[in-house]
C-alpha cells in the first residue's frame, strides 16, 4: 500500500478519535512503573489509555504489579536497601506486608535500569491498589481516560497466581463495582482468562496479547496440540493469529511490535479486529507502526509517540495534569 494511502487512513482514524495511545505501566520510561506517580506522569503527557498489570494478594486485594514476585531491580525493603534476589510472591503475601516495600526507584547498575535512563525516581512509591487507580481516573477532567488491565497469569507457573477463571471474576467484579465497564478493557497473554471474561462480562472488552519471539512465544505455531496459552485455539487449525483471535471471539489484537507487518495488520483489520502494537519506545519503530496503520500504540514513552503524531500533523490525546 502506498505510504500516502496508509497515512490518509491513519489520519481519518485519528480524527475520528479512534487512535489509542496507551501509557505502558503508566509511563515506565519517565516514572516508576505501575505507581500512582507513574500514572500521573502519563496523564500529564496525554494518553488515551493507562495500561497496567493486575495481581492479587494472599488476602484478595487487587493491586498493580507486572511480576508475580517483587522485582529486585525496582524494589527496596523496609530497611531502604534493594532486594538482593527475587522478592515475595504476591499471591502468597498479604497486602499489608507488600505495602511496606518501596518501588519508586530503579536499582543502579542493572540492565533493567539501563533501559530507562530518563526515568525520574519517586522515592516512597508503593504498590497501589486497583481502587486507587480507579479514583485517579474519576477525577474531574479525566472522565475520558480509559484503562487497560492485564490479568497476570501463566499456565507455566500456576501456583504463583490466582487461577484464570476466579482471577477474571474478581477483576470483573471490581470493574463493575466501580462502574467503569465502558472505560475498561481486560487483556492477557493467557487466553483462558479472556475466555472467562467474555463469558461472565460481555460488556467489558477483551484484548488478546501475543508474542512470537525466541524468548517468549504464546502462539506456538507448528507446536503439536497447540499452545497452552491460547485456550484451545491452535494456530495449526486457524493458520494465522488474527484468525485465532477472531475465532476466540476477540475484537482487539495487541501484538509485540516486532511481529507485525502490513499484511498482518491488513488481515486483522479485514476481520474487524483493532490492532495495537506493544511496547514501542524507539522513534523509528513508532514511525514504522504508524506507517503500518495500527490502531494504537502501547509505549513506555508516550511523549515520543505524541511527538511523532505532532510531527505528522495528526491529533493526539490532551494532557490531563493534576
Language-model-derived ranges and their functions:
Residues 4-12:
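Sec-dependent N-terminal signal peptides
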Residues 14-322:
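Phosphate-group recognition and catalysis centered on beta-loop-alpha active-site segments
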Amino acid at each position: 500500500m502506498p505510504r500516502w494511502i496508509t497515512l490518509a487512513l491513519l489520519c481519518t482514524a485519528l480524527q475520528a478519535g479512534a487512535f489509542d495511545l496507551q501509557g505502558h505501566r503508566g509511563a515506565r520510561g519517565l516514572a516508576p512503573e505501575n505507581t500512582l506517580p507513574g500514572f500521573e506522569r502519563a496523564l500529564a503527557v496525554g494518553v488515551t489509555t493507562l495500561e497496567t498489570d493486575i495481581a492479587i494478594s494472599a488476602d484478595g486485594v487487587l493491586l498493580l504489579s507486572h511480576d508475580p514476585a517483587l522485582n529486585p531491580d525496582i524494589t527496596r525493603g523496609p530497611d531502604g536497601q534493594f532486594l538482593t534476589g527475587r522478592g515475595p510472591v504476591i499471591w502468597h503475601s498479604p497486602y499489608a506486608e507488600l505495602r511496606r516495600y518501596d518501588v519508586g526507584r530503579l536499582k543502579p547498575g542493572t540492565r533493567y535500569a539501563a533501559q530507562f535512563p530518563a526515568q525520574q525516581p519517586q522515592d516512597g512509591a508503593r504498590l497501589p491498589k486497583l481502587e486507587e487507580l480507579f479514583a485517579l481516573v474519576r477525577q474531574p477532567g479525566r472522565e475520558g481516560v480509559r484503562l487497560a488491565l492485564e490479568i497476570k497469569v501463566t499456565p507455566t507457573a500456576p501456583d504463583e497466581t490466582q487461577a484464570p477463571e476466579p482471577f477474571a471474576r474478581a477483576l470483573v467484579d471490581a470493574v463493575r463495582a466501580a462502574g467503569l465497564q465502558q472505560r475498561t478493557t481486560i487483556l492477557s497473554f493467557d487466553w483462558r482468562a479472556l475466555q472467562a471474561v467474555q463469558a461472565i462480562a460481555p460488556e467489558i472488552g477483551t484484548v488478546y496479547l501475543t508474542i512470537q519471539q525466541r524468548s517468549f512465544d504464546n502462539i506456538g505455531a507448528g507446536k503439536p496440540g497447540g499452545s497452552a496459552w491460547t485456550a484451545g485455539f491452535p494456530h495449526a487449525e486457524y493458520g494465522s493469529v488474527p484468525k485465532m483471535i477472531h475465532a476466540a471471539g476477540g475484537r482487539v489484537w495487541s501484538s509485540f511490535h516486532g511481529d507485525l507487518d502490513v499484511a498482518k495488520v491488513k488481515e486483522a483489520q479485514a476481520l474487524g479486529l483493532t490492532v495495537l502494537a506493544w511496547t514501542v519506545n524507539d522513534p523509528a519503530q513508532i514511525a514504522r507502526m504508524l506507517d503500518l496503520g495500527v490502531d494504537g500504540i502501547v509505549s513506555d514513552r508516550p511523549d515520543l509517540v505524541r511527538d511523532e503524531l505532532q510531527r505528522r500533523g495528526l491529533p493526539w490525546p490532551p494532557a490531563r495534569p493534576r
